[in-house]
Regions:
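PP2C/PPM-type serine/threonine phosphatase catalytic domain
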Residues: 1-272
Length: 272
């Protein structure tokens, strides 16, 4: 199995970069523990890992006594048994390109992207605003896809809104398909930064190209089947695992949400 994750901390709330790092560490820790060397159920892993990351962000906010919670978007993909599955929450995207054409991409959790009429009172508010993310005081909404069978040369790209907010889907698909992934990624990032200029947002990109087993003999990498629970086979900087994935059921998540809401209520009462 292979895990690819991208999280983009949200502005307008405290410590978005911390929320993103917590999400990356939590999902990476869970993957290491459960992929031995493959996951038993990829979709179940993705949904439970996303909720676990959400819970850990809420726990962090509670322990710090924060009145507003750190928040982040998330997109994660697992490649296993010749197929890809993915999950996302917010507006970090996954693109899949096959034969030079855009096969599919995720849909942002914004009113504009989903083409939903905004609720009453939202007419003057930017419809690009997200209605869900990890770390908010409400349980996150997410979409999952897969498994999608992979073919020779398929390319998958995960990115923050700093890329797609500047470059069109067509531009992204074209550049990703016309050169090697190792060249396409820095070129895409540079193009987005150059086009956005001083108004550029954070541009983060992760990409891969699928090679069928009969055309690719892997000589690198580490299998999770042969490492202990306190060692990471990951490029993600990881913190301690102890206690990281305890109490990650729905009841624990609801308790954390209730604690955050109660803190907000008490703060509002004091100000009144």
């Amino acid at each position: 199995s292979g895990l690819f994750v991208l999280a983009d901390g949200m502005g307008g709330h405290p410590e978005g970069e911390v929320a993103a790092q917590i999400a990356l560490q939590t999902i990476s820790a869970l993957f290491q523990r459960q992929a031995k060397p493959q996951l038993e159920n990829v979709q179940e892993f993705l949904s439970s890992a996303l909720l676990a990351a959400h819970h850990q962000i809420l726990r962090y906010a509670t322990e710090k006594g924060m009145l507003d919670t750190p928040r982040t978007t998330l997109v994660a993909a697992v490649v296993q048994a010749g197929a890809a599955s993915w999950i996302h929450c917010g507006d970090s995207r996954l693109y899949m390109v096959r034969g030079g054409e855009l096969l599919t991409r995720t849909r942002d959790h914004s009113y504009l992207e989903l083409r939903n009429a905004p609720p009453p009172g939202l007419d003057r508010i930017n419809r690009n605003v997200l209605f869900t993310c990890l770390g908010s005081p409400t349980k996150p909404i997410y979409d999952s896809t897969g498994p999608v069978h992979l073919e020779q040369g398929d390319r998958i790209l995960l990115c923050s809104d700093g890329l797609w907010g500047t470059l069109s889907d067509e531009d992204i698909a074209t550049q990703l398909s016309q050169q090697t992934v190792s060249n396409a990624v820095p070129d895409l990032v540079e193009a987005a930064l150059r086009k956005a200029g001083e108004s550029s947002d954070n541009v983060t990109v992760v990409a891969l190209e699928w090679e069928t087993p009969d055309t690719f003999d892997s000589t690198q990498g580490v299998s999770t089947d042969s490492i202990s629970d306190d060692v990471f086979a990951s490029t993600i900087q990881a913190g301690p695992l102890d206690g990281l994935v305890d109490d990650l059921d729905d009841a624990a998540i609801e308790r954390s949400i209730a604690e955050i809401n109660e803190a907000i209520r008490r703060s509002a009462a004091r100000k009144a």
